[in-house]
């Protein structure tokens, strides 16, 4: 935002017009829309009043602010039921599968053994019920993009687990030029709206009444994670650490060692004496390379968050949950100028909570699936599905590093095209690196070892025959297998 535009807003030049626009949107609408427009106005004010991060104020976290998961005490199985009775699990289910060519919710993509992300999430909760006789509520925070489709299949799970779902806020996109809302009323086309990021989870829990319900039922902690993180399961050691400390942290963010593949993700820093999540979008342009340094910023936010429910309620009642505004700029539908989405991240709220800490966990608790390259890894024999519904590295691999997989261009981007190109998933137990580009197909019972690079030239095709073993090979050019 330019200095002149910010000064104009702060002096009241545009803000009254924004308020009028929001009042028009809320006119003749229900209380939910009115509340959401008020919440958006508060977010808009935060955006206007926000100041660029002062890089000189960023420092390293004191050692006591990051606890090693390996230092936690093991939990006796006899204590599990009582501990789990204090827990609510919430999965963030607002995303579509567009990055993998799917139109519906990402959570309904089939991942492994004919199970979707949502099936695996339910399996995790069902396991707790079967093993420990613990009824842990599963809550799904949907967006307006995913709510209807997810609601249609809710009945499949209702006999297995206690499942709740709600639709997070729907906020108006704004014009980058005028900073005024795009929609004219509450019924404007869906392209005029956006879900404002997972930082909306706290206010949405309050608005839906679920926060009060769970507190009244004696629940104490909320475990939040992305539904496409197949390693994010309820962890008894972390829960025990929270419940049985004298002065427990009100907020724990699970972090892992940062690698070069994680450099765009958030990290934890000491800012003005407080623990804070620092995201790439907040970094000054001239400091981006420094931010990407894994030797300087060594930990990475998994977005697995443990939060005290009463603390959420206390802070919301005093309007004390403040989060940095993330500005997401996009081309307007139809290509007519640029629009802005104002978003917040759930992890950014940690600075508001007492005794907030990071907890360094094994990388096995962070198995996200964002692309078909990730999907290939999860579908392969590199991982096995455990009884508790999580994926773990196959013990037969012998070492814990995950292969680097790059499935290039449009031939593999969409799930349907990706599946059409594999008659079955190759044996990848000894794979280190796989790059595939161009028109390439794979037969059955293929084994990939070491570094394998397969590049089909333009207008040519490579068919990898069934039974092939490729170890430290580069395959290029044209290789067709035709029916006789």
Residue spans for each PLM region:
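Residues immediately flanking
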Residues: 93-94, 227, 309, 372
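Conserved core of the sugar-phosphate nucleotidyltransferase
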Residues: 148-320
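Active-site-proximal structural scaffolding
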Residues: 89, 111, 118, 143, ...
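Short capping/connector residues at structural and topological boundaries
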Residues: 101, 105, 113-116, 235, ...
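Conserved short loop/turn motifs at secondary-structure junctions
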Residues: 137-146, 227-230, 363-367, 371
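Glycine-centered flexibility sites
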Residues: 94-97, 101, 197, 266, ...
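Conserved N-terminal catalytic core of the sugar/cofactor nucleotidyltransferase
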Residues: 1-91, 99-106, 110-221, 430, ...
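Left-handed beta-helix
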Residues: 1-85, 240-484
């Amino acid at each position: 935002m330019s200095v002149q535009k910010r000064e104009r807003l702060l002096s009241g030049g545009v803000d009254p017009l924004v308020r009028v626009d929001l009042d028009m949107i809320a006119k003749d609408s229900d209380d939910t829309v009115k509340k959401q427009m008020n919440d958006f106005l508060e977010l808009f004010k935060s955006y206007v009043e926000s100041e660029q991060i002062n890089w000189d104020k960023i420092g390293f976290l004191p050692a006591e602010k990051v606890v090693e998961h390996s230092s936690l005490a093991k939990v006796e199985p006899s204590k599990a039921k009582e501990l789990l009775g204090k827990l609510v699990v919430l999965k963030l289910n607002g995303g579509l599968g567009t990055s993998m060519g799917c139109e519906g919710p990402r959570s309904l993509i089939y991942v492994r053994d004919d199970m979707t992300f949502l099936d695996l999430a339910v399996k995790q909760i069902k396991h707790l019920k079967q093993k420990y006789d613990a009824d842990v509520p599963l809550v799904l925070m949907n967006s307006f993009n995913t709510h209807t489709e997810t609601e249609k299949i809710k009945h499949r799970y209702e006999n297995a687990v206690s499942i709740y779902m709600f639709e997070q806020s729907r906020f108006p996109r704004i014009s980058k030029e005028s900073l005024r809302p795009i929609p004219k009323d509450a019924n404007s086309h869906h392209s005029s709206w956006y879900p404002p990021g997972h930082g909306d989870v706290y206010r949405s829990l309050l608005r839906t009444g679920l926060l009060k319900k769970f507190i009244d039922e004696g629940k104490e902690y909320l475990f939040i994670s992305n539904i496409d993180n197949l390693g994010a399961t309820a962890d008894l050691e972390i829960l025990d650490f929270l419940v049985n400390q004298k002065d427990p942290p009100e907020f724990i963010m699970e972090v892992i060692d940062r690698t070069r593949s994680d450099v765009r993700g958030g990290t934890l820093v000491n800012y003005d004496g407080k623990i804070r999540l620092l995201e790439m979008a907040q970094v000054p342009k001239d400091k981006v390379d420094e931010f990407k340094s894994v030797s300087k910023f060594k930990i990475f936010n998994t977005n697995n968050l443990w939060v005290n429910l009463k603390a959420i309620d206390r802070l919301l009642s005093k309007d004390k949950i403040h989060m940095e505004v993330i500005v997401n700029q996009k081309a307007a539908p139809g290509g007519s100028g640029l629009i802005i989405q104002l978003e917040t991240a759930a992890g950014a709220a940690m600075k508001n909570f007492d005794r907030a800490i990071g907890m360094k966990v094994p990388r096995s608790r962070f198995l996200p699936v964002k692309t078909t390259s990730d999907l290939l890894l999860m579908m392969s024999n590199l991982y096995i599905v455990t009884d508790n519904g999580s994926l773990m590295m196959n013990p037969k691999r012998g070492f814990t590093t995950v292969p680097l997989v790059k499935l290039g261009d449009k031939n593999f981007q969409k799930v349907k095209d990706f599946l059409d190109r594999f008659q079955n998933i190759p044996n990848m137990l000894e794979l280190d690196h796989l790059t595939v580009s161009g028109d390439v197909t794979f037969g059955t019972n293929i084994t990939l070892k070491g570094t394998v690079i397969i590049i089909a030239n333009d207008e040519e095709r490579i068919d990898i025959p069934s039974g092939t073993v490729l170890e430290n090979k580069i395959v290029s050019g044209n290789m067709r297998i035709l029916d006789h």
